[in-house]
């Protein structure tokens, strides 16, 4: 694979190497793919028989899921690291990246599902249960004088940040027309401004706090975003797509990880499938607040 493409997912590849070095082993057990959401949900079976699960956005609304994903059947029940090696031959599409990332999160499940293990690794880590999620409490990170940049508009978090911050600047890959609001008569004053993604360098370089969607991991923009935002006081990555062991994230410059952790139960998998991936209000979903070690 060309070097420039390898660079895209170095973060996930390095994370998988870290997990391998930690002695974490398992086989690919099951994969669920949805076009709504859209999500790739992977399950691995650890060598001790317990199950780990991990999810990643596959951006099906912008990049089509392959018509034929039957090749994944040939990967089931294989050693997870053999699966990852075989995926190298399938290119570096967003879908393949989402599969690789979801596998990395599934491999990370034992570490991420037990904050005591993360604390042993030297991280500050807390667990939160909906609706009391740290993602929905920007006062933990944002001050009234701050300029907040958000990589990706979030329908809940963007206005919450706007209630506190001096200014909220959003960069988006989607057509900005889709985020426009038509106001007739009374117009709301707003400290939120939305820009196309090609303005990212200009916007992120001004920010005190940066919220980064985990989707940037699968679309290959995460390293560029971290470079553009290197002057920020706090950089936060959030969501189910960034639910993997955070060592490499922190080494690259992320300060806070807010991953969503799904239950590994058959009941959750069934509800996920029947709802076509609408996990947002499902019971037993939790969020971690992990801060990188300052030592």
Model-derived segments and their meaning:
Residues 2-164, 293-294:
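Electropositive, gly/pro-rich neighborhoods at or near active sites that engage anionic ligands
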Residues 144, 205-206:
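Alpha-helix C-terminal capping/helix-to-coil transition sites in glycosyltransferase folds
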Residues 147, 208-209:
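Structural motif
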Residues 157-161, 221-228, 248:
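A short acidic, amphipathic alpha-helical/loop segment
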Residues 161-165, 205, 227-232:
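Short, conserved loop/helix-junction motifs that constitute active-site signature segments
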Residues 168-186:
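NAD(P)-binding Rossmann-fold cofactor-contacting core
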Residues 194-205:
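Short acidic low-complexity segments
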Residues 234-295:
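C-terminal functional extensions of proteins
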């Amino acid at each position: 694979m060309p070097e420039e493409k390898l660079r895209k997912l170095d973060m996930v590849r390095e994370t998988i190497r870290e997990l391998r070095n930690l002695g974490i082993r398992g086989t690919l057990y099951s994969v669920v793919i949805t076009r709504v959401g859209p999500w790739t949900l992977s399950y691995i079976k650890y060598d001790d028989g317990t199950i780990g699960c991990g999810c990643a956005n596959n951006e099906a609304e912008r990049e089509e899921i392959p018509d034929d994903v039957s090749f994944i059947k040939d990967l089931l029940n294989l050693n997870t690291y053999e699966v990852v090696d075989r995926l190298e031959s399938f290119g570096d599409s967003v879908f393949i990246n989402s599969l690789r990332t979801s596998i990395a999160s599934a491999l990370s499940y034992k570490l991420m599902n037990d904050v005591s293990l993360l604390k042993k690794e030297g991280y500050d880590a807390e667990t939160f249960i909906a609706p009391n999620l740290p993602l929905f409490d920007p006062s933990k990170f944002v001050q009234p004088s701050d300029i907040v940049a958000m990589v990706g508009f979030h329908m809940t978090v963007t206005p919450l940040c706007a209630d506190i911050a001096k200014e909220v600047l959003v960069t988006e890959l989607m057509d900005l027309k889709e985020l426009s609001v038509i106001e007739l008569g009374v117009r709301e004053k707003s400290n939120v401004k939305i820009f196309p993604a090609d303005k990212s360098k200009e916007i992120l370089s001004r920010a005190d706090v940066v919220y980064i969607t985990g989707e940037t991991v699968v679309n290959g923009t995460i390293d560029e975003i971290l470079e553009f935002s290197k002057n920020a006081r706090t950089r936060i990555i959030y969501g189910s797509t960034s639910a993997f062991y955070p060592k490499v994230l922190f080494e690259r410059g992320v300060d806070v990880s807010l991953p969503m952790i799904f239950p590994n139960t058959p009941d959750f998998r069934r509800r996920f499938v029947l709802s076509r991936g609408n996990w947002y209000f499902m019971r037993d979903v939790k969020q971690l607040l992990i801060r990188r070690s300052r030592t």
